[in-house]
Amino acid sequence: NETDTNPITYFAGDPEEWFCFPCKVGKLLCFVYFNAKYTASALSMANLFELATKEEANQKPDLILLFGNPDGKNATEFYYDETENIWLGCISDDPRIEYFGYLKKMCLTLHNLAAMQQGWLPIHGAFVNITLNDGRKKGIMLMGDSGAGKSESIEALKSVGKDVIKDIEVVFDDMGTIHIEDGIPYGQGTEIGAFIRLDDLDPG
């Protein structure tokens, strides 16, 4: 839910028990602040989001997330700081949030809010660039709800098209954006990794 109060103002944690995970969500710099007890979940983000460089970590972020704020609100909220031009998210401390998905989804929510602010279209789907044996290149985008089979369709495409497809480059596999430059649509991903159900893959 959107809030009209900056979450930083009601941060209730002990700074000595909190850490920052600076990462890139797409092209945006995100600082994820988390309580030490959620270290396992927070560090798992390294599988999906690129770790910011030392130089980037010293810059002003585009996004800020407070994960596990002991504010007693039992809420998941986001806020836009117009003065600083930063999107902020806050997830209240609760045993239920010990789930990596809460971290990932809030990071993506903040990214999507910032993307829409630029006029970009967030897409829940998959986008691939295909190079055929004759040199032609095509882009294919698949959209659908969770579990619809987007990732599995890409794997199936690799199998059934192996005689005509030279290479498949995955641009994004879960969440990305589409934007227009000089009248041409471009796709951009948010993550460097992806989750896939092993039982949906062919052996080998």
Segments (PLM) and residue ranges:
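FAD-binding core of FAD-dependent oxidoreductases
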Residues: 146-147, 153, 174-179, 186
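A noncatalytic interaction/capping subdomain that flanks phosphate/NTP-handling catalytic cores
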Residues: 1-139, 179-204
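Generic detector of intrinsically disordered, low-complexity, polar/charged segments
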Residues: 65, 116, 144-146, 173
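Active-site-proximal structural scaffolding
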Residues: 100, 121, 146-150, 171
